[in-house]
Every structure is written in structure tokens, then in C-alpha cells.
Amino acid sequence: MEKHDIKYFENKKQCQFQEWYEKFKSVTFSSIVIPLPKIFIDYLQSDQFTTPHEGFPEFKVDEHDDLFDDNNWSTSKNHISTLDPKYYQGYSDEEDESSDDDDSNDNDKDKKPKRIVNETEFKELSNQIIKSIEKLGGNIFPKLNWSSPKDASWMNVYNSLKCTNTTDIYLLLKSSDFINHDLMQFSINQDDKDDSLTPYVLVLRKWQNLQPSMEFRCFVKDNQLLGISQRDISTYFKFLKDKKQKIQDAIVKFYNESICGKFSNNSFTFDCYVTKDEQVWLIDFNPIHPSTEALLFVWDELIPELIEQDQDEKENEETKQAKEELPIEPLTKLEFRIIDDESGIKPNLAMTSRLPLDLLQSSGGTGQGNINDILLNFKNQNLN
């Protein structure tokens, strides 16, 4: 591992939820951290998913949290209230696994445990999760050390991260590419006992009815708040223009009073949520690194000297385009960016997890581009 990779991983470890939660407990949502045994990690990394039929509710009605019911700030959503069986499938070794992408998945399969783990084998953990859900009011959303399975939310009966039982949680965790990435951060000794604890934790956070329009990412360099970006850059929220200054003032006050000088690093990013009465809540911390989305900024203007990349590393297309259009000047004072009109909307990269693998590969791995070009490319590949 190279020197800058080691530095990044050390910074990333400081952003693990269990590393900062106790210090910032008063300004974030109530949560319970559960250490995970090796057998559960094996379960998440295996391709097997089975659950008793009674684990799936036949009907659910979404309930809003009174404290964070900010629906009047955004367009109402259509909530899924009935179970669609096609989203819940059991897989076994007897199924036909032949497909065009077999070769591309061979290496991934080799890394995964070959054993099949049944949920009854970690019943004690499941009981602990059930009790924790009850303590948090019956509705939670899950995450691991760093990531939440937001890319798999469409698999959930609520079409969100809201979970009410272990089946909801296990389905989201096993369906998420983000969670799979978390599981590659630490090496687990396969010779360890099943009940031995791993570096991984399951975080259960009290469910809040948050509106994506009021989530923001903040960028800090040497304890100076340099940038604030709209978190959901795939949507234009017209009302944000009128609220922009009040939102900025609220975030700056929150940072100065609750975050500045208290995190374990001087340069980092943090996500926060602003309620309709300008109360700010901390959501998460992330390290300064190209793997952390800069959203409406580019890293060269935020913290260029801290972004260590190999010369041969492929540049992000947006970064290359920005460099060609005009020189990038590093920011010296706070800048708050939102999408000012519909022309500023950017692709939601998390949505690529919902695309068919063949289509994703045909679009260069991003799912972006002119759909006619993608389909033509896909057709030509099949003809060859």
C-alpha cells in the first residue's frame, strides 16, 4: 500500500460511525451500534438469501415522523404499500447461473465465502437487532461503518431505507453495492470462529422522514468551512433560491458551535440536514478524497494539495471538462452552491445500481450518455 493510500485509509477510519457518534451524539439522530460477528459478514458476502415467508409483511403504510415531517418543502412521493414478490427472490446453488457476465464475476465469486449461512445461525444477533429496533421506536434505517445501502432502497417495500424488521435490513444490506464496498475495507481471517467479532458494525439509526432537498454536504479545510453543496444534484428545487441565505447562516452557525475543532481531523466533509425552521442535524462524516463526491464542486478548487492521485489515474470527465473551459482557482472563502435551474441537473450515480449490467457496461460503466448511442453500441456488441 502506497503512502498516500495509507494516509487516506487512516482518515477514512476516523470517519467510521462508531468513531464519532459518542462525541456528536447531541447533534445527530439517535442510533445504536452493534458489533458484527464473522458469521454475519460471511452471510452478507455470500450470494445466498433466504428468509421465512412470514418475515415479509403483506401490507405496510408509511408513517411520518412528526419532528422531521418536511413534506411541505418538497414534492410528495408515491409510497409503495404492497409487497411485490418479484423484488424478493431466493437463490441457491441449484439455479442456472449461466449468463453473459459469468467471466466478469469469476473473481468476485472467488473472494466470497463458499459456505451457505442461514439466518438461524446468528439468531442471537437477530434478537439483538429486534430489541434495538424497538428501543428506537420501531422504525430505523441501517448502515455499516461508513455506508448506508441507499443504492438498494428500491428493493425495499417502502422504496426507502426505512426498516421495521430484520428481513428489511438483511435484504437492503445484501442488495447494496455500497455495503459490498464497505466489506472490502478490512480483511477477515476465515479461520476465525463464527462468533468472533470483526471490525465491522451494524448501525441502526432512528428513522426520520427527511426530504432530500434539505440535505447538504459541507467541505472543511484546516478547520475552515470552504464549501456547501446541495446533496441531491439530480433534482432542481426551485424554493432553495429564496431560502439559500437562511440555510447558509444556519449551517455556518452549526459548524462553528458543534463541529469546528471537535472532529479528529482538520480537513473533512460532513453531511447535514436542515429542517424547515433552520435547525441543523449532523448526518455523517466523510474523508477528503476523490472517492468522496464533490457534488457541485471539483476537488481542484476545494483542497487541491490534499488530493494525491497517480498521474496515470483516469480523470473524472467533469473535472477534465472544467479544466478545458477555464482555469480552476482554489476557493479562499465560503461558497454555497445549489442548482439554479433545470439545466444544472447532474446524473444521480447511485441510480446506476438499478440498471441492467449489460446496459451499464455498454455505457462505459456510468449509465450516462445518449440512450440511442448506448443502445446502438449494445446492438453492435451483440452482432460481433
Curated annotation (Swiss-Prot):
Kindly indicate whether the keyword Nucleotide-binding belongs to this entry.
yes
Tell me any Pfam family this protein matches.
Answer: D123
Highest taxon, organism lineage: Eukaryota
Ranges for region Disordered: 90-115
What GO cellular component is one of the record's annotations? Answer: cytoplasm
Q: Where does ATP bind?
A: 143, 146, 148, 150, 205-207, 215, 217, 231, 271, 284, 286
For Mg(2+), which residues are the binding ones? Answer: 284, 286
Any single GO BP term: eukaryotic translation initiation factor 2 complex assembly
UniProt-recorded Gene Ontology molecular function terms:
ATP binding; magnesium ion binding; protein folding chaperone
Biased composition annotated in UniProt, kind: Basic and acidic residues: 106-115
Query: Main site of residence?
Result: cytoplasm
Under InterPro entries, the record lists: CDC123
Keywords in alphabetical order, please: ATP-binding, Chaperone, Cytoplasm, Magnesium, Metal-binding, Nucleotide-binding
According to its UniProt record, where is this protein located? Answer: Cytoplasm
Acidic residues bias: start-end ranges: 92-105
Q: Per its database record, what is this protein's job?
A: ATP-dependent protein-folding chaperone for the eIF2 complex. Binds to the gamma subunit of the eIF2 complex which allows the subunit to assemble with the alpha and beta subunits.
Q: Identify its protein family.
A: Belongs to the CDC123 family.
- Report the protein name in the record: Translation initiation factor eIF2 assembly protein
Organism, as annotated:
Dictyostelium discoideum
Q: Which gene encodes it?
A: cdc123
